[in-house]
Amino acid sequence: VKWGIADFIHTFGHTPKGMWLPETAVDLETLTVLAENGIAFTILAPWQAQTRGLNWNHPYNVRLPGGKKITIFFYNDAISSSISFSPNATTNADQFIDIYLKDRFNGDGSDELVIAASDGELYGHHQPFRDKFLAYLLDGALSETGIQTTYPARWLQEHAVEQEIEIREKTSWSCFHGVTRWSDVCG
């Protein structure tokens, strides 16, 4: 965590507000270490919440030992899986918005957040020209829809997070069996 923070400061010139956990592998000890090092949030998969029936378009706080807390954002599984595993989903940004984004909001005018998570190497390495898809999506196609782009640190500056949840200990995004893929045979 300290190395990640130091690298972020070296690269971007300021301390990070959040941190992506590798494979979103998480437990309370890890969240506590993040909070103790000034990290305010991380992003997890929806199935990493112990609490059920949540609105994934809003972040939640997790109470940590010692009276600390950390905010958890959840990525949208359907959108993220389509981006990562369905090459046709990311060929046309306008169609992507129509198929994957427009129906994700409740339409009542309240602020909602839809997070897509994918591996960075997807854009241009695994899928040729997906970097251009992403650039047009963010800098062109979305501007005509009323959907605004943001990022978690900015969201936290503009919105209070009041609800608390519990996480499922020792889980990750990439394995429904938890984190045993790194210490044992998965499954």
Locations of regions flagged by a protein language model:
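Active-site and substrate-binding clefts of carbohydrate-active enzymes
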Residues: 57-80, 87-91, 95-187
